[in-house]
Amino acid sequence: MAFKHISIAQTLELLDKEDVVIADIRDPNSYQAGHIPGSEALSNANIAHFMMEKEFDQPIIIVCYHGMSSQGAASYLVEQGFEDVYSMDGGFTAWEAAYSEKVER
């Protein structure tokens, strides 16, 4: 099984589902400057804890800057047994351009 690609519009729709997880893998300063509401900062330092507290069938959307690095992180989570993993195409840059009112600062 592989991760799936998801658009920013599809991500916006999924935000209404309470069990969806948005994991932001950008650097801490970028995350603090602005992120998708409800997203969690995910890094090498906290990934083990992140994986322990999530369900394998829980939808997880990985967000990076432009949608490239998120693909590697999404692949890693699938390799660890997570079944419903997405890489958001366009990354936070596209999200902020399209939905500037939906950026938590």
Curated annotation (Swiss-Prot):
GO biological process assignments: glycerol metabolic process
Keywords of this entry: Cytoplasm, Transferase
InterPro entries: GlpE_sulfurtransferase (IPR050229), Rhodanese-like_dom (IPR001763), Rhodanese-like_dom_sf (IPR036873), Thiosulf_sulfurTrfase (IPR023695)
PROSITE patterns per the UniProt record, alphabetical: RHODANESE_3 (PS50206)
Entry GO terms, CC: cytoplasm
Subcellular location: Cytoplasm
Active-site residues annotated for this sequence: 64
Catalytic activity: thiosulfate + hydrogen cyanide = thiocyanate + sulfite + 2 H(+); thiosulfate + [thioredoxin]-dithiol = [thioredoxin]-disulfide + hydrogen sulfide + sulfite + 2 H(+)
Record-linked Pfam families: Rhodanese
Residues in Rhodanese domain copies: 16-104
GO MF assignments: thiosulfate-cyanide sulfurtransferase activity
EC assignment: 2.8.1.1
PANTHER family for this protein: FAD-DEPENDENT OXIDOREDUCTASE, THIOSULFATE SULFURTRANSFERASE GLPE
Chain's role: Transferase that catalyzes the transfer of sulfur from thiosulfate to thiophilic acceptors such as cyanide or dithiols. May function in a CysM-independent thiosulfate assimilation pathway by catalyzing the conversion of thiosulfate to sulfite, which can then be used for L-cysteine biosynthesis.
HAMAP family in alphabetical order: Thiosulf_sulfurtr
Family, per entry: Belongs to the GlpE family.
Full protein name: Thiosulfate sulfurtransferase GlpE
Gene: glpE
